[in-house]
């Protein structure tokens, strides 16, 4: 069968164009309807504490997936409307996991140390932490204890550090390694306090800055990530009336940033598309996904404020009547007294308790409502997280009336990929495999497999370098980073062009003129065999780790938009990539990169246009919103070495890119595929300019994602578990079928270009640096077989680590990748730097410096707060400095002709 490269390329492009032109628009959505999320409700076994009543304001949580409710209060004998007395309980009830025991019943399993209600409770891995509360509605408690079970599954109570201030009617939340409490009453007096306890190792509660504004009683809260850190969000609640101010149901919220230790104001609770603010007094906050908080229940602002302010109005009217009695004032007083008497006797619907899910997004600072249900209309209810289901327990449906209802609420995503998208994606994958098959048939020997026979044009090599270094990390994580923060990472990409000039002048001549196949051959000639083997081995470890990450990213995207299991996606992607790159060698990899590069850039340009066009106000809205929220900020001029400030970005970017472009076999191998040194120079410069100018598109995508979802917050996936999936989510939720499939194929292109290059470079490093060195008599065909076997092994190892990585909590995959780069590769850059520019440094000194540099990076990582962006610079500087000092004590004589910059010039 005669398969030509042009036929493969033309067929692939024809498939994409034809299917894209036949794209189908996504289904129309009603106003404020999210077609990506579905909400379901189910009634569970009621909890009846006294007669038909439940309780309000209990402690609640789960222990070994069983539901636990403790304490609470109600009016058991005479209703509150008739002057009944509130009773507080100490009883602890348990319900077996609803899915494992659908017919399970609540049963009493013990008692609290005393009757309590209106405290805060959070579920931790060890059990349920119960905080504060009141035994009588007057006196506050400071006790904190852990409800848990012993080895015999018997309920136990273990004291924890007490609150510095006794509190009740406050709120509490757990996350980021801390338990937070804020607001409430101290023996009847409202307070603005906030505390946190490091759990489980904290010995005392830390006093946080008081939150701004008036105090809050019965606010809601949650711990959730914002763009950069874990934060405590305090929302709603009410401020009781005092001598100078009326009672106020708060419609705002405040965010405590755990990194900056400061409170910042949240947007007022005005859901998108509405004009009237809401309150969340008596509501509960639930963390959803990686950046959403769902609030359930709570009172109606107008009805509640009228009720709590009515006694004050009556008093004021009575005083006015005494001073100047009029019939109008008397009528007002009569009406107020009538309303007061009738307040407790209306039907449930009159009170208008919140019956919607009120959802806040921490990145865009927006509110939406979703899914009305009468089952949600409760205040003072308890919340229990049970797997992916939210259990809402009891609470009151109107003042004084406690519900016994227990409701399960589940929010799921309903992704659909569609046959057109699948066809586009499969056509692309098949085309790449055919490309590999074509070049496998052209291959002659190991030299072709490793260097492509020197037949690669300089422009193709340049595009290949760009596509290889781009990867899915750039295609997904850079837009996600710009969407969540700003453009402060962009100058790092400019340093690629800056680094290109010293690479061309000082490094390229060594790799081309010494005619090496592996970059680490130079290290043996310059230093010794140990240095070469150690460097090559470390490179292989780094490449396998990198393969795992760039395998994980697109699999994450495919899972987010199709619903296919993440682990299946990883395995599928790995197998396709292994087959493709094992067959065709570096020539297939390079030409595959060229095709993939056009798909990547074309897809990105289209996405930018669509995002700007879809933002309310178009280009003007895009610019205004982006400017207002500092989405285009390029520089942080502070001198904080712990964050992405300008000098950290520049210093770290220069070091990390110098490491990649001077010691990474994946890149250096491209220098060796061109016909001559001039072609290699041109390819490096082309990559540098593409990195500067094309990367603007990816940051514009990030800003566009922010402006689009800022103006369409109801279109977000409220359950999105990884922030890096925001771009592929946009593709699938907003773009027509076919176009979406093509952009998803672009993510696969980014992945395959990087993975195939990594696998090929690992095979080169192992075959040349280890196999051929220890088996010098091996033939070219034997070396080729070893190289292909290494491709398979390396790919499988990368796949295994990617499967493990899927279980980790990583806030930003871009940050994680840069951290791995600094930890594992800084020493390699140092070796090439000292080899070329420091002729007095010998092999022994280089090894000592290398080890010290790696150790310094790990010490910096685990003992300081230094930004991960500086790890590469720290490691490289330390290794060179230590090696240079050691060279005065460990002197070595060696002929360095042609092996360092001084001698190669001659």
Label the model's feature ranges.
Residues 13-22:
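Hydrophobic h-region of N-terminal signal peptides that target proteins for export
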Residues 13, 26-416:
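Kelch-like beta-propeller repeat domains
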Residues 2, 407-411, 631:
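A short, amphipathic alpha-helical segment
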Residues 1-12:
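Bacterial N-terminal signal peptides that target proteins for export
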